[in-house]
Amino acid sequence: MQGQAKRDYPGSFLHQATWYREHAALEAKLSRLGLLISQGMPVCRTLVLHPVESLWYQIHPGWVNGLNAAEPAMKRLERQFRQLFHWLMQTQTDFDYGDEGILATHAAVDAAQPAALRVGQMRYRRVVICGCTCIRASTLQLLRSFSAAGGELVWIGTPPRYIAGEAFSECASLAAAGIRLPLRKSDVLRYFRAQPQSVRIMDDNAAAEIYLQMRQTDDCIFAFLWNKSMSRTLHDVPVRIPDGLYAELWDCRDGAVYALPVRNDCVSVSLAPGAVRTVRLCREQRALPPLPIPPQTEPVFLRSPAGFRLNEPNVLPLDRAALWLDEELLCAQDEILKLDRTLRGRLGMEQRSGEMLQPWARKGPDTSYPIRLCFSVLCEQLPQTPLLLALEDLPAQTLTVNGMAISLCKAAGFWVDSCFSLYALPAACWKLGENQIEWTAAYSEVCGLEAAYLLGDVGVWFRSGTPVIGCLPQTLKIGNLVYQGLPFYSGKVRYLFDVPADQKFWLQLDAFGGSCTAAACGGERTVFWGSDPIPLHSDAARTLELELILNRRNTFGPLHRFPRKQPYIAPDSFTCDDASRYCLYPTGLLCAPKVYFEESICFGGIQR
């Protein structure tokens, strides 16, 4: 993570990530899903002609602005492309995109009824043309042959007007013999929902949120249902299946398999936000346990944690400083990465960027220059224990806090990455109000100015938008940790809740800020994502440990980039015009956990 590496993308999947130990649970789940979704052959009968060649015909200087189209015609093509994808998926119509180059080489019409367009091992009975302004002559001939054999052509919107870049009207006459639909959501949904499907979502309201894919093997069909909504839980969605088949639910989280009851050729499936359900349809009924479901009782809300634990010290990033070059003040106060650019510009050095030459590839002598950095830290409560200062890249020559010399012997311990050196700052060196941390170092082209990090058993509180050192909170409330003394903390937070002893119950989280969660109640620790309820069993200890695994965003940034959600994060995202305002992600338990007890009990003075 040294220097620019902490702003590289994608980020590290190694021990620097708070969630790296929990990542195995996610990989196991996705590996099971990946294995199942590769079985047999796709149940896919629709081919959508990809309009990429219509885009290439319109390419010219200035057609694009960064990653976005700049021309109205290009924007319209991109919009239509997105719209058609979502409309088809909302009707549970699985499809493949057809590239005209691949079709010219590998596609052929199979006239045996029902007619099919054969591409490799796939056989398509329907071809959809939407958004194409120009197609190849070979594509037009293929579509004409497919239509003549009885294949279904669906033309959405305006048919192509150009063939190989020249104006032709043949597409319009071919479209007149096919199915014409306006480029309107209601018409597209109505048509495709009316088409026969072996598996169908019977609730149109829920169907708009569910994407479906199926795989056919020799003895079964696997149906994969994904709730694309990240905020809406879909309860008891009726799914119609072929007559005479039995249903099984395969849980990719732990590999368990359960029987799903079939009533009137329908199964009932519930989907938490973002959840995937894998349903196996087969002709032989197996002896399987029933799917465990939470009891249909009123939930108990856990609103008051009995305590909490942190697995790392709290942290305050120091990313604004004053800079001196050989006793000349270059800048009285600025963001640290801007100071680095200022210093490199003054010294005639190449700026650090994603295209910079790696330090170990440089040749020749490396001249160094004496610099001094000063960070200001506000303190409203004096620390009771020593703090640690994490520095990187620049070996300190001298280090002082409020004029008190600090030993340059590195303190024992480790924090996040080996690039950080830790220095102990005695509690006696701090004072109420403003504190000054200064260090001198030798700067060279292979170095870089980076933020420092203050670590310890202290709280960090915002006063008029400025972070101030105070007391670490004694308890945590349900809500955003940013406003509870832990705004920049990025380790793990373990919430402790009192629960009745020796009880079976289900735990559900509707909203949290972090990467994932883990729960234990005296037994095995369960890692989970999303808001799917999980079963637990309390022991005699009567304590539910709910651990929230955060990510490093609020520690390493970008800390000042507005708005919070960006289309992408790159090295340039870490500098901005106003580094005095912080833009942090909400972390912690953002709403009270819900518990569903399987037996009637008295909990918190209330009969459940």
Where are these regions (language model features)?
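Glycine-centered small-residue hotspots that permit tight backbone geometry or close packing
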Residues: G151, G491, L509, S515-C516
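C-terminal structured "cap/appendage" subdomains that terminate the fold
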Residues: C130, S138-L142, W155, W415-P426, ...
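Short, small-residue-rich loop/turn micro-motifs
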Residues: G403, L509-A511, G522
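Carbohydrate-binding surfaces of carbohydrate-active enzymes
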Residues: M1-A451, D457-G491, D498-D502, V595-Y596, ...
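Active-site-adjacent substrate/metal-binding segments within catalytic domains
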Residues: R372-C374, R494-D498, F505-L507, G514, ...
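Solvent-exposed strand-to-loop "edge" motifs in beta-rich extracellular domains
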Residues: E392-A396, D510-F512, I549
